[in-house]
């Protein structure tokens, strides 16, 4: 049985803003309309490293996205209703752009502007000593992989991840992470060890990447292993915040089984024990069309 879930979280409001009514469509009688776009028309805060995403009301195998003056790849999902555009290089910060959705209903241009994230930091060393928090239950955090189970997983991740910059220069970033006492991330949980990361390449500043590396964190009172933990994001030019954050890793769900209803060791009964085995969470998410991965540790689960 498989019981490891690949988790990818995004912390960027600009990546999820949607607006159907503001999109100007040149309609044709094909029965397909644009349901939503990200960024929405008129959005002025789009993350410069974000993918453009469009959802249609019905399948259209001809649909694609292009961006004026930008090279990239337009991709259509298996359902032919969702499509995305990935630029070959990051967009410029604080810059106006237009992307166009070409589909069976015609062409729909959408104007948007990138946020200031991506603007150069004058003195990278000024980041030293700064502490940043990632609240995994914040409204602007979206669990995108596995699709459809974000709300389920978020209920188990009542933690904040704190990142402190130890040092930074034009080429190297040194950061260590720690868990907050609660999801607000206002205070470190000193009973849990810090999570050191190897020195990171900072030549792409203000963008940074940490990991991947395997680590163990405490969640809801249980030690949970995250394999290949990877964190990335972009610091604001004045170092006051970071955005466009991505946290990615494979979570071993076995220690979290007692969090399921009726699986608490103090409340379980012979009637519920069969539903509380190591693969219980995997069986739960199977209902959302999500399959766990092999833990790869030689066990049966």
What does each of the following model-derived ranges do?
Residues 14-17:
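C-terminal motif of bacterial Sec signal peptides marking the signal peptidase cleavage site
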Residues 91, 95-101:
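Short beta-strand segments enriched for Tyr within beta-sheet-rich domains
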Residues 73-79:
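Short beta-strand segments within Ig-like beta-sandwich modules, predominantly Fibronectin type-III
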Residues 23-27, 117-301:
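Extracytosolic secretory-pathway proteins
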Residues 1-6:
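Bacterial N-terminal signal peptides that target proteins for export
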Residues 20-64, 103-126:
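N-terminal non-catalytic regions of secreted/periplasmic and cell-surface proteins
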Residues 79-85:
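Aromatic sugar-binding surface patches on proteins
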């Amino acid at each position: 049985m498989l019981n490891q879930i690949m988790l990818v979280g995004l912390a960027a409001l600009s990546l999820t803003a949607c607006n159907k009514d503001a999109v100007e469509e040149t309609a044709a009688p094909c029965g397909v309309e644009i349901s939503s776009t990200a960024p929405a028309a008129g959005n002025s805060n789009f993350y410069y490293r974000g993918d453009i995403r469009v959802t249609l009301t019905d399948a259209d195998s001809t649909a694609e996205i292009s961006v004026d003056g930008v090279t990239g790849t337009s991709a259509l999902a298996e359902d032919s209703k969702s499509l995305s555009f990935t630029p070959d290089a990051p967009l410029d910060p604080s810059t106006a752009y237009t992307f166009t959705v070409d589909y069976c209903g015609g062409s729909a241009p959408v104007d948007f502007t990138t946020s200031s994230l991506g603007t150069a930091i004058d003195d990278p060393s000024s980041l030293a000593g700064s502490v940043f928090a990632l609240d995994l239950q914040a409204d602007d955090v979206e669990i995108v992989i596995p699709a459809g189970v974000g709300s389920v997983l978020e209920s188990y991740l009542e933690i904040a991840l704190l990142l402190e910059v130890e040092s930074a220069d034009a080429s190297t970033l040194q950061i260590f992470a720690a868990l907050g006492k609660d999801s607000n991330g206002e205070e470190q949980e000193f009973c849990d060890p810090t999570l050191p990361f190897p020195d990171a390449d900072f030549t792409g500043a203000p963008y940074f990447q940490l990991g991947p590396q395997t680590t163990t964190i405490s969640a809801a009172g249980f030690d949970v292993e995250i394999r290949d933990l990877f964190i990335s994001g972009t610091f604001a030019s004045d170092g006051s915040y970071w955005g466009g954050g991505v946290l990615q890793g494979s979570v071993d769900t076995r220690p979290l089984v007692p969090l399921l209803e009726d699986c608490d060791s103090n409340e379980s009964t012979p009637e519920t024990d069969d539903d509380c085995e190591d693969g219980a969470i995997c069986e739960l998410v199977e209902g959302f069309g999500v399959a766990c991965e092999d833990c790869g540790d030689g066990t049966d689960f």
